[in-house]
Amino acid sequence: MKRTYQPSKLVRKRRHGFMERMSSVGGRRVLMRRRMKGRRVLSA
């Protein structure tokens, strides 16, 4: 059986990166919450 997590830097950036987060209202909310929490890294 193939494992579920097959890491790829490109797919990670495209799906969870900063530009992707900024492209939707929900994604911007994620960034806002992470800023409020004081996260050093906001997105992939």
From Swiss-Prot:
Pfam families: Ribosomal_L34. GO terms for molecular function: structural constituent of ribosome. The keyword Flavoprotein does not apply. The keyword Ribosomal protein applies. GO terms for cellular component: ribonucleoprotein complex; ribosome. Signal peptide: none annotated. This is Large ribosomal subunit protein bL34. It comes from Orientia tsutsugamushi (strain Boryong). The gene is rpmH.
